[in-house]
């Protein structure tokens, strides 16, 4: 009985180490428009984590679609819209952004994901900041 229990625990640990860790993660982004007076700080969720993948030897003989690797990407998401404060009348003050509801390991879809290897470091404000909290700005 103890041997079965011990083996099942070891099997569970081995499977747990092999699983992917891809889930919604809190993320803060800064949004500004050159015509508007303020920068808006938004707290949202994005998909982040690690996915199990294998690098195939013999890449020369495989079609391109077989060479792509899985990434942590959206399974389900919704869009929220906020109003950037301090915009003149001729400028549309609304900004829409995705909120991750659930994530999965899969192929990167460029229709709604940024599939680059290295992010550009532009997540900062050059104008006075306003924070956005659940439906209204402060």
Curated annotation (Swiss-Prot):
GO biological process terms on file: G protein-coupled receptor signaling pathway
Keywords: Disulfide bond, Glycoprotein, Hormone, Secreted, Signal
Residue positions assigned to the propeptide: 133-138
Domain of life: Eukaryota
CDD domains tied to this protein: GHB_like
Glycosylation sites: 43
Signal peptide: 1-20
Compartment(s) where it occurs, according to its Swiss-Prot or TrEMBL record: Secreted
Disulfide bonds: 22-72, 36-87, 39-125, 47-103, 51-105, 108-115
SMART domains: GHB
GO molecular function, one term: hormone activity
Any one Pfam family match given in the protein's UniProt record, by short name: Cys_knot
InterPro entries: Cystine-knot_cytokine (IPR029034), Glyco_hormone_CN (IPR006208), Gonadotropin_bsu (IPR001545), Gonadotropin_bsu_CS (IPR018245)
Function in brief: Indispensable for the control of thyroid structure and metabolism.
PANTHER family from the UniProt entry: GLYCOPROTEIN HORMONE BETA CHAIN, THYROTROPIN SUBUNIT BETA
Assembly and binders: Heterodimer of a common alpha chain and a unique beta chain which confers biological specificity to thyrotropin, lutropin, follitropin and gonadotropin.
Protein family membership: Belongs to the glycoprotein hormones subunit beta family.
Protein name: Thyrotropin subunit beta
Lineage, highest ranks first: Eukaryota, Metazoa, Chordata, Craniata, Vertebrata
């Amino acid at each position: 009985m103890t041997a079965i229990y011990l083996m099942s625990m070891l099997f569970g640990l081995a499977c747990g180490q092999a699983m992917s860790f891809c889930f919604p993660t809190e993320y803060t982004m800064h949004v500004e428009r050159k015509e508007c007076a303020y920068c808006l700080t938004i707290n949202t969720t994005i998909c982040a984590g690690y996915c199990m993948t294998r690098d195939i030897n013999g890449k020369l003989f495989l079609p391109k679609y077989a060479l792509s690797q899985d990434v942590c990407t959206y399974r389900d998401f919704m869009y929220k819209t906020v109003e950037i404060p301090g915009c003149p009348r001729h400028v549309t003050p609304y900004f829409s952004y995705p909120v991750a509801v659930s994530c999965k390991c899969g192929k990167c879809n460029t229709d709604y994901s940024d599939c680059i290897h290295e992010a550009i470091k532009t997540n900062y404000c050059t104008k006075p900041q306003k924070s956005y909290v659940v439906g209204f700005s402060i």
